[in-house]
Amino acid sequence: PVWSVVTVDQSKPYTITGAPRVIKGKVIIGNGGAELGVRGYVSAYDANDGKQLWRFFTVPGDPSKGPDGAASDPAMEKARGTWFGDNFYKMGGGGTVWDAIVYDQELDQLYIGVGNGSPWNHKMRSEGKGDNLFLSSVVALNPNPGKYLWHYQGTPGETWDFTQTQPIMLATLKID
């Protein structure tokens, strides 16, 4: 089947720099552009017809607008308490998933690596307070229906572009 779908809001300066991943009948794709003031997310589309199955935002949006109606809504309730002020949602928040997406078949978990904040300066973005979940985190999702499972944040309050967007490798190692 051949289909085409626009995966980003074209009124904002999103970019797409990573390849999609295909798992379990789904095409998974993130986006880039945190440095340009966008809000990050990863989306799953039906591999047969391109219909969006779910979306997981990586940073909270404007609280006055309420939940997004996305798979990430429960996780965003948790994340919202780690952000302060209102600059982050006015300036995008960042947290794009522009490359690091990998699927663990054994655990049936999708791992996404989340990028930098927007604006980059923690003091401007969140009054210099809070961990700013899920910036610079590896987030594990259930690939059906995109439900949050767990996360590890490598750089709380990320300001230095120490992101988790490098390729994620899964390996079984014997360590003595």
Where are these regions (language model features)?
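Conserved short loop/turn motifs at secondary-structure junctions
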Residues: G33, E127, G154-G157
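Short Pro/Gly-enriched beta-strand edge/turn motifs at strand-loop
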Residues: R80-D86, P119-M124, H151
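Surface loop/turn motifs at the tips and blade-to-blade linkers of beta-strand repeat domains
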Residues: D9-S11, M91-G93, Q153, T159
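Short, small-residue-rich loop/turn micro-motifs
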Residues: F56, P60, V114-G117, N142
